[in-house]
Amino acid sequence: MAERVLTQRELNRATLARQLLLRRVRLPVVRAVERIAGLQAQLASTPYIGLWTRLEGFRPQTLERALEARTVARGVLMRGTVHLVSSSDYGLFGTALEVASPGWITPEAEEIARRAAGSLRAYAAKPRTRVEILDWLEREHGIASDGTNRIWYALRLQARIAHAPEASLWRAPVHGPSFVSVEHNEVESEAARGELVRRYLAAFGPATRAEIAGWSGMKVRDFADSLDGLRLLRDEAGRELLDVPRAPLPAADTPAPVRFLPKFDNVLLDRRRVLPEEYRKLVVRKNADVQPTFIVDGLVAGIWSFKDGHVTTEPFAPLPRAAKRELEDEAGRLAAWLR
């Protein structure tokens, strides 16, 4: 049987559907965050906006309660970037990504972190500052910080240390972010990598092996043995695409409503699918600073800002009258929610 070929527009609609951007849904926060494989969260506020644009009736207090209950966690995961995920996924994804430590993390730092991880989880059961954790490491294990981020970064990965809830609350002033260990079930490394691949495809697919690697930070060889049971498809260029069976593949003409995305939203990572090349430099600035954007008919069409109680939009090109009205209506709803 010939492999199905998907057009660029069909791939666009597939990703939007899986990222809950074709229609808002009613889901508990933890389930929603798991459904979309987490949210980038360099800024504590961005997951709140990302969930508002995806969930019907979302209120900031809902996510705050999940943070305080420690059913979600905000910490370093894919590509060494801060993400908000469920606490269960924090352990699963962290185990899968142990093979993907940045090259600047030395083997010595990784070994130190492995030795200290178990006792650090207990020490960080209540919030600790970075200084407290490094002082503890020297006091309990006789290991002084080397003056770089190597040991600190390795500790956060190995011990599953995340930002404490108070560092991630809506509009909360943060003075000296603190960190806390995340309870999780131990998972075998290869099984964790296979599950991470499937979770990515369910949230962003179909995708190439290179796209899986680009999102996760793993190398293709790290998950090459974890691809059994996946569906094979092709894009218009003939590239092989992987997907989980029975995942949604909406028709190319499926309506895509106007949606506002926060800075660094995950859906922009595969820029070709949602972000037109001619607008890339307007959205992705120096130092990979990704601007808050809005999408019209499934594609990024401009950037937005919020000031003095109002959302201001800057389209990259003139919009059709109907799209402009829809954009204004959605901007009004976002402004009312942000006030």
PLM regions: where:
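Long, low-complexity intrinsically disordered regions
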Residues: 1-274, 279-339
